[in-house]
Amino acid sequence: MLALGLLLALPTQAAEQRVYLVATMQLDGSSLAQSIFLHEPGITELEGCREAVRAGQRDRDWQRYHHIFRSDRFKGFSGHMQYRCAISDQQFSSWQDGPRYNRSYLIGVDEHSKLNVERTSSQAQCMTQLRALPAARQAHRFCAMGNQQIMP
């Protein structure tokens, strides 16, 4: 009984659900992509994220989830941006735009907008893991390089 009381007395901390904007630049005609995970503390609902995306695309001025697509870095190539709003209990280091997108991730956003990010050893390993999934799960996942860390 004492052991049970001690277990109940231990502080427990539920994982905090956060709303993220997953912004992905996909190089057209390839599997190469870069993704960033942006969090705005003032946005706590998916609809708030979606509205921020609509406003950012419409006004071409990202007041929320501030980022800049540097098309000048892709001379001779074409790519497109894809935005997904998602909820996750995972946390990521803050994003700083820079040249080192050297972390490979298998990223999933399911039909309920639940974000799951897994670190893989390489882009090739990520593609191997992705192809091993059933088709229904593959449809909600992709591989991308990032420069943020998954926080413990």
PLM feature spans:
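Bacterial N-terminal signal peptides
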Residues: 1-9
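Mitochondrial intermembrane space
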Residues: 14-152
